[in-house]
């Protein structure tokens, strides 16, 4: 399941006040004028959220995620591309068309390089 179920610890880091703006319809995330392809899904919750950098022991998340929402269904986060099901070819899809990038159960998947950029940001606006 793509929605995270276990978050272990929050991490305190230097923060960047500029929000990440995610457009679900175009499957992109932008910081000011710099935009990046993302994997999203029809269940990606829209709204404005604070981001909390958290460590996780869940497999396939590479140790940390940026949590933006938690509810009874689980935890929604921005994280590196989840490769728990290799048949989904998520790394390839990240480079594909918008329709290729609509695959997640609500989380926002990004490349390793994009995650490194996003990691210091503490606000996301999802449209």
Where are these regions (language model features)?
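Classical Sec-dependent N-terminal signal peptides that target proteins to the secretory pathway
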Residues: 1-6
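Hydrophobic helical h-region of N-terminal Sec-dependent signal peptides
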Residues: 8-9, 13
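Gly/Pro-biased beta-strand-loop elements
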Residues: 15-88
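Exported/periplasmic cell-wall-interacting domains
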Residues: 55-127
